Amino acid sequence: QVSEALNMASAYKGELIAKYGESGTCPTVVTDLGVDSFGAINSKYVHSIGLNSTYSGAVCAFEFTFNTVGMSSGVAGKKLIFAMMHYTGNGSARWECTSTEIRQLYLPSVCKGI
């Protein structure tokens, strides 16, 4: 279930990098990432995407909120954050994914231990 967000994140990472590369600032509204103003996503497991301005040390960040129905109790309604920690230019960046709400057991291996 969480891996669906990981797969979806690639497109949103690209949008965020492009916006940051153009303006030097983070998007301020989710429509800048190509989703509607409510952040709604047509997905089996992911309910919405939002911007996250509180992740410590991040240049920019976005987060997925998981659906509450038909989900593992360890994931239902919880958030997974993707944070751009360093913009290296030329369309690339260093990323972290993490969650303070989802136990390590449920996180994809690339998100564990962060």
Predicted ranges, named:
Residues 1-25:
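Membrane-proximal N-terminal amphipathic helix
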Residues 20-114:
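Periplasmic/extracellular, small/polar-rich flexible segments of pilin-like filament-forming proteins
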